[in-house]
């Protein structure tokens, strides 16, 4: 899932898009470590389970988007019901819970309905980023 698609997906799902594309971060002369994005647990999941999401090394005070998606028919099919945004703290970190779904009705980043997504058979993932930075993707497997 590209950064452009992540921002577009978030705005399609009613999440306020950020105005900045990371120019302030690019203007800083301090070198930053590559961001880390993790989800725990990411396997043996059940429908409606809360997972812990952790981000570090991102830009401070920046808004990012997170969504559960799967490739369906050559396009991203994301869950608009759970897609949301989060903001990193002064050190570029964030920790929060996210509810994952074993199945959902997916939509493309443009908002076009794709149909049913079953994460028991599809390669579902949790992805995060904004138009300036892709934080990463973590594969989700359901038991």
Swiss-Prot record:
Listed name of the protein: Antitumor antibiotic C-1027 apoprotein
Annotated InterPro entries: Neocarzinostatin-like (IPR027273), Neocarzinostatin_fam (IPR002186)
Alphabetical UniProt keywords: Antibiotic, Antimicrobial, Disulfide bond, DNA-binding, Signal
Signal peptide as annotated in the record: 1-33
GO MF term list: DNA binding
Disulfide bond entries: 69-78, 119-124
Function per UniProt: Binds non-covalently to a chromophore which is the cytotoxic and mutagenic component of the antibiotic. The chromophore binds to DNA as a weak intercalator and causes single- and double-strand breaks.
Gene Ontology biological process terms from the UniProt entry: defense response to bacterium
Source species taxonomy: Bacteria, Bacillati, Actinomycetota, Actinomycetes, Kitasatosporales
UniProt entry tagged with the keyword DNA-binding: yes
Family: Belongs to the neocarzinostatin family.
